C-alpha cells in the first residue's frame, strides 16, 4: 500500500504544479484540499495551496493553511515548507 500512496502523492504533486502553471486556482484549491484529506503529510500540497492563495492576494486563507500545516506536519517538514515559500 505504501508504494501506491507514494505514487498517488507524486501524481497529485505534478497535477498541482501544472494547475499553478495554468493559473487554475479554483481547481488547485479543490485538488490540493482533497489531496490533503488523503495524505495530510503531503508538504507539497500545502505549498501549492498556500502559494495559490498568495497569488490571489488571499493572505488570511494562506495564513490559515500555514497554521494547519504547522499543526499537521512534522517540524522538519514544516521548516522545509517555510523555506520553499520564501523563494
Residues covered by each model-derived region:
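TPR alpha-solenoid repeat register
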Residues: 11, 45, 78-79
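Alpha-helical adaptor scaffolds
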Residues: 1-38
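Canonical tetratricopeptide repeat
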Residues: 14, 48, 81-84
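Terminal, low-structured helical/coil segments at or just beyond the last alpha-helical repeat
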Residues: 63-87
Amino acid at each position: 500500500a505504501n508504494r501506491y500512496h507514494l505514487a498517488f502523492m507524486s501524481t497529485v504533486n505534478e497535477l498541482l504544479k501544472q494547475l499553478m502553471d495554468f493559473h487554475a486556482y479554483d481547481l488547485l484549491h479543490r485538488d490540493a484540499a482533497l489531496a490533503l484529506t488523503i495524505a495530510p503529510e503531503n508538504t507539497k500540497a500545502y505549498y501549492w495551496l498556500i502559494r495559490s492563495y498568495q497569488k490571489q492576494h488571499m493572505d488570511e486563507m494562506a495564513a490559515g493553511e500555514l497554521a494547519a500545516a504547522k499543526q499537521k506536519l512534522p517540524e522538519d517538514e514544516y521548516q522545509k515548507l517555510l523555506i520553499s515559500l520564501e523563494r
